[in-house]
Structures are given as C-alpha cells and as structure tokens.
A protein has these predicted regions:
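Active-site gating/metal-coordination segments in enzymes
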Residues: 22-27, 77-203, 252, 259
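Hydrophobic faces of well-ordered beta-strands that scaffold small-molecule active sites
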Residues: 35-39, 59-62, 90-95, 125-127, ...
Length: 367
C-alpha cells in the first residue's frame, strides 16, 4: 500500500514540477554528456572506455589501497594506460599507502608519490576506510583521519589544488544485524565481509565516532575540497546529509554505491528526497562504483566486479537504471529494497550539474 501511495504522490509531484522545469526522458540518456566520478578500472582492456563512449560518459577511475584490488602500482599502471588511450574521456585519482605512517620520512615519501601521480595526470587523491577501521600506529592504536600525522600531506594536496576523495566509515547499516539492514546490497556485502561488519565487532569504533573524526578533519582543512565518497556515509538520511553540507562549505558528496539507500528514503518521502537534490544540486556528484577487476577466486569487492564480454552490457544497464531514477519519472522495480521506485524527475538544469558540471568544477578546478 505504501508503494502505491508513493507512486501516486511521485507522479503528481513530478507533474507539478515538470510544468515549471523541463526534465529529461529515458531516450535522452546517450545524448546528454555525463561524468561518472567514481569507478574502478583495474584491467588493461578497452571495454570500459568503449561503453563509456557509447553512453556519453567521462570516467574518474579511483585507485584504492584495497586488499581485493590489484596492488597500487598495478592500479596506477592500468589507469595511466587507459588515460593514454582516451585522455579526454578517462581520468584517474591516486592514493597513498598507510605503510610506515608516523615513521620518519613517511610524509616526504607520500608527498613525492602524490607529485609523481599529478605529473601523470591525477585529478584527486583518495583515502579509504582502512583509516579509522584497519590501519594502526606503532602503538597498536587505530589511526583516524583527524590524526595530526596527516596534516602535512593534506596541506600538500591543498597546495596542488586537488580535492580529497574520502571514504570514511561504512553505511550505517554496518552497525546493525543483517536482518535489520535496510537494503539487500548492504546485507550481502557485510555477510561476505564480516571483518567490516561492525555489529560483529563491538570493540571497534562506533559509527558516530568515525563520522565525528571525519567531520573534525573537514573542519580543520577548510581550504581542502573534500568529496565524501558514498554520500559521505550519511546515505541513510538526506536530513543528516543536508546538515553536513550546510556545516562544511568545502564538502561535496558522490552517489557511488548508495542509490538504493536514497531510493529507500524516496519511497517513503518522495517530496523530501527530490527537494534535497534540488537544494544541494551544486554539491552532489554522480558516481556508480562500477568495478572492472581481474578475475580472482577470492574476489569479494563491494560491487562485485564484472569481467569479460558481459561488462559493457551490465555497465550500460546500471547507468541507465540510475538515469531513469534521477532524471525521469519512470518507475522501476528495485529488488534491493523490494519496492517499485518512481524516478525523481529532477529538472534538466539539476541533472546537468549532478551528472557533469559539478565533477568538472571539483576535479578540474576551472580548467
């Protein structure tokens, strides 16, 4: 019953909004220029670039110090080859290793590695959730993002006019038992990644403490543009996201791998979610988290990578589904939340920012 009312309300709301603000259609998908600001292209093949070209996307492939991915050098080599193949369409973000953090020379080595990546074309630097959840200092204590040991590196990144992409904490579902999680994609991920399922590790940092450390970091580095990967791990509440964006003018967020959490909310309060996207249209970047990784029997990536001949079709399907939700009023079944989800039908001017202009502003600094 709730879904039926949501669909009716969405149709009425979209109709009223559409009278004043033109929207895109499903058929507009390939002709509108777009930028996926969060992918992982870890294979030296051209299929990702091919489907991106066909669908009208530029890509930002993000290197991550993630044990399920190839090592950092291999990731860097692949992204540089793909950038050379299509420099106008393919871009990349670098990262750094936490190995040796706090020891003499770590800051200098890290800054030198960042400079080398910039020389190769890096547009941003990524920090991952191992900061705060895995990496420890020489005393055996977890290292949080607001640790002063990062300050000189962050100042260096800021001096180079690069943004920092920060994946901190996890979806709030991570601190719930599996049966209480709101989306099936979170449930399956944490079932397969028990080491990151914080409900099973009450001795580990709380969700609130990780978010607080991230917020202190963003406040301390006001001159650094901080892109909150995965909706800044505030995916569960557009109200909390609004508070975060209001408090920190240097913050933006990407949508990567969190669309179902947004859809979970829009099924319950369509008008609120639509209004959030309109109000914060300059602060939200489209990202998918699509991952093309070498096949591995032990692979357990958050978005299971799609390899081989099926990748272009699956990527195209994923992108079109997101487009239908954000840009049109089309309703589609979303199994991850067991609901029929009407599209938000955001105005064209809003879509153009979320899908392209914001990424160009943040990552190219006006270039």
């Amino acid at each position: 019953m709730r879904t039926r009312f949501a669909i009716l309300a969405a149709a009425l709301f979209a109709s009223a909004a559409g009278a004043a603000s033109p929207t895109y259609s499903v058929s507009d998908f390939t002709r509108v220029r777009k930028f996926d600001a969060h992918v992982h292209a870890n294979m030296d093949v051209l299929s990702f670039l091919t489907v991106a070209k066909n669908d009208g996307f530029e890509l930002l492939s993000i290197n991550v110090d993630y044990p399920d991915f190839p090592d950092l050098k291999t990731q860097a080599d692949v992204t540089q080859k793909l950038q050379a193949a299509d420099p106008k369409r393919f871009h990349f973000a670098t990262t750094f290793s936490m190995q040796g953090f706090g020891a003499p020379g770590w800051t200098e080595r890290t800054n030198a590695a960042i400079d080398a990546a910039i020389a190769e074309g890096a547009l941003a630097v990524k920090v991952w959730k191992n900061i705060g959840m895995v990496a420890k200092n020489s005393s055996g204590h977890l290292i949080f993002l607001d640790d002063p040991g990062f300050d000189d590196v962050m100042a260096h990144i800021q001096s180079k006019h690069l943004p920092l992409i920060a994946h901190q904490a996890e979806p709030k579902n991570c601190w719930l038992p599996l049966e209480q999680m709101t989306t099936e994609n979170d449930r399956s991920y944490f079932k397969d990644h028990p080491e990151y399922h914080m409900f099973l590790h009450p001795d580990q940092p709380s969700y609130e403490s990780l978010i607080a450390a991230r917020n202190r970091f963003v406040a301390r580095h006001r001159g650094l543009q901080v892109v909150g990967a995965h909706l800044g791990s505030l995916e569960w509440s557009v109200d909390e996201l609004a508070k975060y964006l209001d408090t920190y003018p240097n913050a933006t967020v990407d949508l990567a791998a969190r669309m179902t959490q947004v859809q979970y909310q829009s099924v319950r309060d369509y008008a609120k979610v639509q209004a959030f996207f309109v109000k914060y249209q300059d602060r939200i970047l489209y990202g998918s988290d699509l991952t093309q990784n070498p096949p591995s029997a032990s692979e357990r990536a958050q978005n299971p990578p799609i390899t081989g001949a099926e990748f272009p079709a699956e990527a195209d399907k994923f992108w079109r589904s997101d487009w239908a939700y954000l840009a049109t009023n089309k309703s589609q079944r979303v199994d991850a939340i067991s609901a029929d989800v009407p599209g938000l039908a955001l105005p064209r001017s809003v879509i153009d920012k979320i899908y392209y202009a914001n990424a160009r502003r943040v990552f190219f600094n006006g270039r």
